[in-house]
């Protein structure tokens, strides 16, 4: 799947960053333990290699390469969970979040089958989609959330007005705060 995986561990060993790479893509995922993996495990994984959104505060910036395939998305939490040494079924709290590199809702075609596969493998996991709220049809997200009861949608707002938000997130085709509040 991936040609190379680099792992960087924090000095206190509570956080591990993974960089997955191959000739035409890079993805990042992060593994957190609170305070142990069997108590609470949180994974943040990528849905795209780079990101087309261009948030001013994000390291992915405007360096968009491509959207990841569903199996490339799934392979990230699978690898991270293997590295915990704990059976995911025995974790008191497991969260898999789509919020590392890329805008998940700009890759719904691949995200939805990834969500189905992850739910089949880890039915106890909360599957959380973090989004800036691009102007898109939210129907597929609402539909899959009825099929998979552990899915959650969270909006990355970052600012309290559309004007200030536009400076921080220059992506033109994002939903207004009013639309997000109506979806929310």
Task: Please report, for each region that a protein language model flagged, where it lies by residue.
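Short secondary-structure boundary segments
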Residues: 5-12, 17, 73, 95-104
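Flexible, acidic/Gly-rich N-terminal and inter-domain linker regions that tether
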Residues: 1-41
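Canonical Radical SAM [4Fe-4S] cluster-binding loop centered on the CxxxCxxC motif
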Residues: 33-79
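Non-catalytic surface loops within mature trypsin-like serine protease
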Residues: 22, 33, 49, 157-159
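Conserved AdoMet/S-adenosylmethionine-binding subsite of the radical SAM
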Residues: 81-184
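Short linear Ser/Thr-Pro motifs
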Residues: 8-11, 46-47, 130-131, 156
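Basic side chains
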Residues: 17, 76, 164-165
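Residues in well-ordered beta-strands of folded domains
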Residues: 19, 30, 46, 97-99, ...
């Amino acid at each position: 799947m991936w040609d190379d995986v680099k792992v960087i561990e924090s000095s206190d060993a509570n956080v591990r960053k993974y960089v997955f790479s191959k000739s035409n893509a890079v993805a990042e995922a992060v593994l957190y333990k609170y305070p142990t993996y069997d108590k609470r495990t949180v994974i943040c994984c990528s849905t795209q290699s780079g990101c087309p959104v261009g948030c001013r505060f994000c390291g992915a910036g405007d360096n968009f390469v491509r959207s990841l395939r569903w199996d490339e998305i799934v392979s990230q939490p699978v690898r991270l969970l293997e590295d915990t040494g704990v059976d995911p079924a025995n974790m008191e709290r497991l969260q898999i979040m789509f919020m590392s590199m890329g805008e998940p809702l700009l890759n719904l075609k691949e995200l939805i089958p990834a969500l189905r596969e992850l739910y089949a493998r880890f039915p106890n996991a909360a599957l959380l989609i973090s989004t800036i709220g691009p102007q898109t049809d939210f129907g597929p997200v609402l539909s899959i959330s009825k099929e998979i009861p552990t899915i959650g949608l969270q909006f990355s707002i970052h600012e309290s007005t559309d004007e200030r938000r536009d400076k921080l997130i220059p992506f033109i085709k994002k939903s207004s705060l009013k639309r997000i509040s109506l979806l929310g």
